[in-house]
Amino acid sequence: MLQPHLVIGSAFTFGDAFFTLFAFAILLVLIRIYAWKPLMGVMKEREEHIGSEIDAAEESRAQAEQLLAEQKSVLQQARVESQTMIENAKQLGEKEREEIVKTARRESERIKEEAKTDIAREKEDAISALREQVGSLSVLIASKVIEKNLDEKEQSNLIQDYIERLGDDK
């Protein structure tokens, strides 16, 4: 049959409560020794592992940010260098253009001066030839007028005299 202390609804006794409390305390001590400490060790290892993974991820992120900043710096420096090269090329091109223009102007001035010199020389040659022709024609006309032939010396003196008068008239 049933024993009275096992029946539901039986009376509560202090001994049963003390025994239950003592058994529960022993169970807690055993759980703490054999289950809780290993479980806490595993949890602590897991926490440390997750912490180290987070630290590694943060370090990787910091390295990635540093690398990104370095790449941005290198890219900016390359942009500045390329802009400087472009500006230098523009300035060099402008200087070369100015030098070419100066050289062309000097050459045109030189050609112009040569042309002026050539024109002046040709003018002098033409005037000289014209004077000689005028002198010869004058002598020829004069000799026909006076109907006598002049010798070479008289002709030369007459031409020289006529040329000097012609030069004085101008």
Swiss-Prot record:
Domain of life: Bacteria
Membrane topology summary: Single-pass membrane protein
Keyword GTP-binding recorded: no
Pfam families per record: ATP-synt_B
Entry GO CC: plasma membrane; proton-transporting ATP synthase complex
Gene3D superfamilies in the record: F1F0 ATP synthase subunit B, membrane domain (1.20.5.620)
Molecular function GO labels: proton-transporting ATP synthase activity, rotational mechanism; proton-transporting ATPase activity, rotational mechanism
Protein family per UniProt: Belongs to the ATPase B chain family.
Function field: F(1)F(0) ATP synthase produces ATP from ADP in the presence of a proton or sodium gradient. F-type ATPases consist of two structural domains, F(1) containing the extramembraneous catalytic core and F(0) containing the membrane proton channel, linked together by a central stalk and a peripheral stalk. During catalysis, ATP synthesis in the catalytic domain of F(1) is coupled via a rotary mechanism of the central stalk subunits to proton translocation. Component of the F(0) channel, it forms part of the peripheral stalk, linking F(1) to F(0).
Subunit structure: F-type ATPases have 2 components, F(1) - the catalytic core - and F(0) - the membrane proton channel. F(1) has five subunits: alpha(3), beta(3), gamma(1), delta(1), epsilon(1). F(0) has three main subunits: a(1), b(2) and c(10-14). The alpha and beta chains form an alternating ring which encloses part of the gamma chain. F(1) is attached to F(0) by a central stalk formed by the gamma and epsilon chains, while a peripheral stalk is formed by the delta and b chains.
Protein name: ATP synthase subunit b
